């Protein structure tokens, strides 16, 4: 088991009332890349890797529950105490090896409906044309426990919805005037590949009670089409319901999810009957579009801060401009307009310093080896109570990319300390590097996306190195040639006394270096184009 000793820990300052009031109603933030550690009440985007993010506040305790697809073959729930972090994950359901819902598990959403936790998702037999909507219902009260499957929902034509049953993804549910409804993205006919938004009443959380109704056309405006020309088809998907001030609206993603032009549109319920298309009014312009630096934005959800004072907008964005689905997750504050409609502003840039949501818990020290944040592709982490493996190459990769995978433990260590860990490389002498992060703040997705220090081993060049990062750039501080036997575990140690940093290997002193850029922060592990297991962590 891991053994963690803490000698000196920082005490976080409380967020001042001024910043709470300023942040609640203001969409501005500090975009400067400042030198030095971030404060405990600050973070940067992107907060994690993934697509189609969904997060909900637990009505029973002060925490957030994130629901995400796990390699398109399972569903995971992450638990965190802030919208600014996704937390540790637990896989709650795995698809069977074969059958109609064994593959392409997409866009799961966790809802608390009629006293039970339920997960709505889409799945297929491996052929996209066979996607249908399903629901999992928790067996007990624990959202991290076992679930029973129901479905598929009758999302097709005819009074029974099964004449025939038709393609459906991105289902979400909502209650309006004591009636339950489902909204989803579906095809108009078999094999059409034309996606529209549909709605149907529900007689229970696991069953639709009436025929589907198409809410609107998918190509009223050029910006809804996969490309903004009349010859291209329209595409509406990922509906999300927003309710505030007795107003109900539905945001939706449109355009092409694989292109940088993905964006959000909005429907407003302006009539009395949600099942009547005439009751919905479409906004003539998109409500959220990409920028030069943050693009391919969509599949949003909306959630309040733990103290209820702020609304937050969570969405995914593309990692690069090439066609495809490699994405990561952003979170930023939003406003609610005078009529109760969402006002989203513009996507924030990566590495922008932002205040954490009001009411977020402040970690004052590392609590356990189980209390960490992971930053990297979700399929490249393997964790047990005794070890953490980073850089794992999955057998069935889904939109994978390397990003300097890392874990950062909750709570900061300040003052003098010593940290050690045992590392085992799994990809031999070709490994680039792996090692210890310390005095780390502002971790994010990306090779050098943190502020703090890194001490590690480079097997391919037999080096012991020390460097620091400012959130975007790497600066090497010192290097020394060492003998590295990648077939055996190695023990890496870092000691910090004032501005003196000492790095050692296998019980032998390596080198010392003086630097005072970062004075406090968390510890963690990182790999760079490597596959390594970390175990036997000690912190004194």
Annotate the PLM regions.
Residues 201-207, 257-259, 268-271, 335, ...:
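Short edge-strand/loop segments of extracellular domains
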Residues 34-59, 84-111, 144-175, 203-240, ...:
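Surface loop/turn signatures of beta-propeller and other carbohydrate-active proteins
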Residues 51-71, 106-130, 136, 170-193, ...:
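Hydrophobic core segments of beta-strands in well-ordered, beta-rich domains
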Residues 34-36, 342, 346-540:
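Extracellular glycan-recognition regions
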């Amino acid at each position: 088991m891991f053994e963690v000793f803490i000698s000196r820990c920082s005490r976080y300052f409380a967020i001042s009332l001024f910043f709470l009031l300023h942040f609640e109603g203001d969409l501005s933030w500090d975009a400067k890349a400042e030198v030095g550690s971030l404060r405990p009440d600050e973070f940067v985007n992107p907060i994690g890797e993934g697509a189609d993010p969904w997060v909900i506040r637990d009505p029973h305790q002060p925490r957030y529950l994130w629901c995400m697809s796990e390699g398109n073959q399972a569903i995971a729930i992450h638990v965190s105490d802030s919208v600014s972090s996704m937390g540790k994950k637990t896989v709650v359901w795995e698809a069977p090896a074969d059958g109609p819902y064994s593959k392409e598990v997409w866009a799961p959403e966790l809802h608390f409906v009629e006293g039970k936790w339920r997960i709505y998702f889409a799945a297929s037999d491996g052929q996209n044309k066979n996607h249908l909507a399903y629901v999992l219902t928790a067996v007990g009260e624990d959202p991290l426990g076992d679930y029973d499957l129901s479905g598929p929902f009758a999302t097709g034509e005819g009074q029974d919805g099964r004449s025939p049953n038709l393609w459906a993804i991105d289902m979400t549910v909502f209650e309006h005037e004591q009636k339950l409804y489902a909204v989803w993205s579906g095809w108009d006919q078999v094999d059409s590949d034309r996606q529209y938004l549909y709605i149907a009443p529900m007689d229970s959380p696991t069953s639709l009670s009436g025929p589907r109704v198409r809410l609107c056309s998918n190509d009223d405006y050029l910006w809804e089409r996969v490309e903004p020309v009349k010859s291209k088809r329209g595409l509406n998907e990922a509906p999300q319901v927003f309710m505030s001030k007795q107003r109900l609206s539905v945001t939706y993603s449109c355009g092409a999810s694989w292109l940088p032009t993905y964006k959000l549109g909005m429907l407003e319920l302006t009539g009395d009957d949600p099942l009547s298309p005439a009751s919905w009014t479409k906004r003539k312009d998109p409500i959220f579009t990409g920028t030069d630096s943050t693009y391919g934005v969509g599949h949003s959800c909306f959630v309040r801060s733990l103290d209820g004072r702020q609304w937050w907008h969570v969405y995914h964005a593309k990692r690069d401009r090439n066609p495809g689905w490699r994405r990561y997750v952003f979170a930023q504050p939003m406003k609610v307009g005078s009529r109760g409609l969402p006002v989203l502003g513009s996507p924030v840039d990566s590495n922008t310093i932002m205040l954490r949501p009001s009411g977020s818990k402040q970690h004052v020290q590392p609590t356990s080896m189980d209390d960490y944040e992971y930053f990297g592709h979700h399929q490249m982490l393997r964790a047990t109570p005794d070890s953490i493996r980073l850089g794992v190459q999955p057998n069935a990769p889904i939109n994978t990319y390397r990003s300097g995978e890392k874990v950062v433990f909750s709570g900061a260590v300040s003052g003098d300390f010593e940290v050690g860990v045992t590392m085992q490389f799994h990809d031999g002498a070709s490994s680039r590097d792996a090692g210890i992060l310390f005095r780390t703040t502002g971790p994010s997705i990306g090779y050098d996306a943190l502020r703090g220090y890194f001490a590690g081993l480079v097997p391919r060049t037999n080096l012991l190195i020390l460097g620091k990062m400012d959130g975007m750039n790497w600066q090497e501080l010192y290097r020394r040639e060492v003998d590295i036997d990648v077939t055996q575990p190695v023990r890496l140690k870092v000691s910090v006394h004032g501005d003196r940093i000492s790095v050692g290997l296998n019980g032998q002193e390596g080198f010392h270096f003086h630097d005072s850029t970062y004075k406090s922060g968390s510890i963690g592990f990182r790999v760079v184009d490597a596959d390594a297991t970390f175990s036997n962590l000690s912190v004194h």
